Amino acid sequence: MSRLIVKNLPNGMKEERFRQLFAAFGTLTDCSLKFTKDGKFRKFGFIGFKSEEEAQKAQKHFNKSFIDTSRITVEFCKSFGDPAKPRAWSKHAQKPSQPKQPPKDSTTPEIKKDEKKKKVAGQLEKLKEDTEFQEFLSVHQRRAQAATWANDGLDAEPSKGKSKPASDYLNFDSDSGQESEEEGAGEDLEEEASLEPKAAVQKELSDMDYLKSKMVKAGSSSSSEEEESEDEAVHCDEGSEAEEEDSSATPVLQERDSKGAGQEQGMPAGKKRPPEARAETEKPANQKEPTTCHTVKLRGAPFNVTEKNVMEFLAPLKPVAIRIVRNAHGNKTGYIFVDFSNEEEVKQALKCNREYMGGRYIEVFREKNVPTTKGAPKNTTKSWQGRILGENEEEEDLAESGRLFVRNLPYTSTEEDLEKLFSKYGPLSELHYPIDSLTKKPKGFAFITFMFPEHAVKAYSEVDGQVFQGRMLHVLPSTIKKEASEDASALGSSSYKKKKEAQDKANSASSHNWNTLFMGPNAVADAIAQKYNATKSQVFDHETKGSVAVRVALGETQLVQEVRRFLIDNGVSLDSFSQAAAERSKTVILVKNLPAGTLAAQLQETFGHFGSLGRVLLPEGGITAIVEFLEPLEARKAFRHLAYSKFHHVPLYLEWAPVGVFSSTAPQKKKLQDTPSEPMEKDPAEPETVPDGETPEDENPTEEGADNSSAKMEEEEEEEEEEEESLPGCTLFIKNLNFDTTEEKLKEVFSKVGTVKSCSISKKKNKAGVLLSMGFGFVEYRKPEQAQKALKQLQGHVVDGHKLEVRISERATKPAVTLARKKQVPRKQTTSKILVRNIPFQAHSREIRELFSTFGELKTVRLPKKMTGTGTHRGFGFVDFLTKQDAKRAFNALCHSTHLYGRRLVLEWADSEVTLQALRRKTAAHFHEPPKKKRSVVLDEILEQLEGSDSDSEEQTLQL
């Protein structure tokens, strides 16, 4: 665990000081102090280190030590969801809600209040019949509640009798249209009208107030009925969404209406405004500012306009909200704000400018009073809705996509660290770790794609919440982006050429189409013409002596040799290019198919657009180059964008270089600067441009270096052959092993005598499926002498309390399973004959002779033909030199990258025993059955086998 929790920190602790205390013990990846929501320090913090060793040192040093006057406690953190994690006891931690049981003796304050009210009500009931108490109440009541002409004496009984006739007398004069429309639903209207106190009954109203109340009610009732009917029609068209927005736009009005609903029923109509008029006057306060940036303003609207008229005016558009502006008196001002959902609807609404609505032309323009945050509209998504997918993203289940999004990564981590962490769960197909373009440091999140989705599910369940280099990882399922190549290939209208380019670009990272030192024939011809001060037409002149194809092939061979010499001088290991299945680099790119005369500055400009470059190696002639990036992410971006893209007039062929392509770490900028920018002028001064008939003085060291490298390769090949070959007498059979002895312990004992090639203990499964040792095993050495030495020295040696019984094993060692996947080791040179494969069918034997005769005198050139003996050859041939030295020189020159008629020649050393008579004998044995043996011969062979087995058993008994 590389993450620590530090408890009981002093109150004055700052993050800078906290970081400085622990920075002396290693690289910090996280440093945080914890505070409450109010900003109060909780006296603990977290520290993350890059490695566990650094965290252990810091924990050992600071645990139970003092900072100022506080004794701190330093402990290792637990992973999220760890069952051994201690339970939080702080008051700030979330605790499960448990209902509190009230004590038995205690009573709630609500019960006490109810008891007090009941007691007061009981006392008032007793005093109702008391006349003196009623007189006391009438005297002490408020003057506003009693008429000035009323009698001060107690006159309760007459008032009760007079109230009914008065109301009955004035009931006929009441207007049925003035009945209140705000009574509860389900009650009879006639009963409400008879029970409701009318304006004429209220004595405190004057005649003028009574008339005013009649006028306001009539106007408001008619207008409210019209608006309600229009609103109902609009709401039916818009749906429930508009209702929710209208209700949310005026929450203050709803509160005021709900509070004053009960008060307005008993209040005079003239003293208080109707709710409709009050709502209209209060609307502008909330609707001066547009709610979104997609708002248009309508000016010059009729004063009797409704939302239905606005909807008809803007049809077929469907506005999100319509706000009709009113002044303080509730009158419409002719301005209307209309909100739309996107910018396209706004542009269509602006086309309605100066069109007519109700006999008046309307001006439509964009609202200028828009919030400062221009661009996208407000994010109306809720937290529970999750992230909205982008245009090029599609949602897919983790069990199908196999792609993870990892965040809270340390800024000091690398792609290798992430690959090591996640490759434990399965093979990875892609790892995308974004970096900052300025600082070149990671952004703290990455995308991991597994080859098999079930491995991604396993990694998601185990890695989420784990501590990685001092920080707690957060892993989420990721979305998948649609690849542009698939879209391009799916279009039916695209031409075949575009489809082919998209397919080549998609397969650019595949290793099946890579050729390390590939050179285009057109670029080869240009380079040859520049080298020998000739024209391109002279290079392709078919009337001159010799074949044009052979001439281009020899020119390519010479250029390849110069490129190899240049790469060796610049610290490039050519041995890495010969390994086809080698691991590929993530930062070094081989750039091929460049036009002749390409400059290093042009490559720097092309590739430097995608990131920082390290070394750019461009040999003379400018046909093949090596470009090194400093960051893997930038290298992948350049590879993805530039593969098969047009450079000048030819497509670029890119290939990832093998790992270890540079033998030296420091870049040699001098070589890059010395690269000739004008090869035509500087060719005579360069040693590489010497014609074929002359040999420069500086060429010997390079030849010696090539010979040394070839000698090293031969030694390595011999060692590999020795490892693969199992000589007799190298394997020991060991008995009487302890069942607890492991293969590592046995190998450690026998490796003291010599180099152990393999060590195995025979095991079998029990009923539970557990492998158990059988008490014997085998140890194989590289040489028989080492096995004999171990037999003498370790006979009877005690291992885990058991004396070993050692003897030479006669069984043939079974090859390991991994040997079948090893690369084929090329044959050694035993003769002067070379087997040439992949010969183009249009090539003739004279062209093969012309090509190979450049390196020495030939003995024979044979191209086997088909079975019929007529027509073309079979695509391979044999070239036999007079001497082995000439054959070796030709093999080393032509085996790298020599193309004849566009096909690369593949060279191998022919078998010395393969002759014409041997081939005929082998073919006859394949098609004809061997002659039957006589019975006597078969019996003799059986007797010989039995005698041999008896002698072997006797020797074994003597040894025991």
UniProtKB/Swiss-Prot annotation:
PROSITE patterns under this entry?
A: RRM
Sorted keywords for this record are: Chromosome, Cytoplasm, Developmental protein, Isopeptide bond, Nucleus, Phosphoprotein, Repeat, RNA-binding, Ubl conjugation
Localization, per the record, is: Nucleus, Nucleolus; Nucleus, Nucleoplasm; Cytoplasm; Chromosome
- Cite a GO CC annotation: nucleoplasm
Name the tissues where it is expressed: Expressed in the crypts of Lieberkuhn of the intestine and in intestinal neoplasia (at protein level).
SMART domains noted in UniProt: RRM, RRM_1
Give the Phosphoserine positions (modified residues). Answer: 174, 176, 180, 936, 949, 951
- Glycyl lysine isopeptide (Lys-Gly) (interchain with G-Cter in SUMO2) cross-link site: 481
Question: Where is composition skewed (Acidic residues) in this entry?
Answer: 176-194, 689-706, 714-726
**Compositionally biased residues, Basic and acidic residues:** 273-286
Q: Where is this region: Disordered?
A: 85-119, 149-294, 491-513, 667-729
The record's similarity note reads:
Belongs to the RRM MRD1 family.
What protein does this entry describe? Probable RNA-binding protein 19
Record organism: Homo sapiens (Human)
> Top-down, what is the taxonomic lineage of the species of origin?
Eukaryota, Metazoa, Chordata, Craniata, Vertebrata
Gene that produces this protein: RBM19
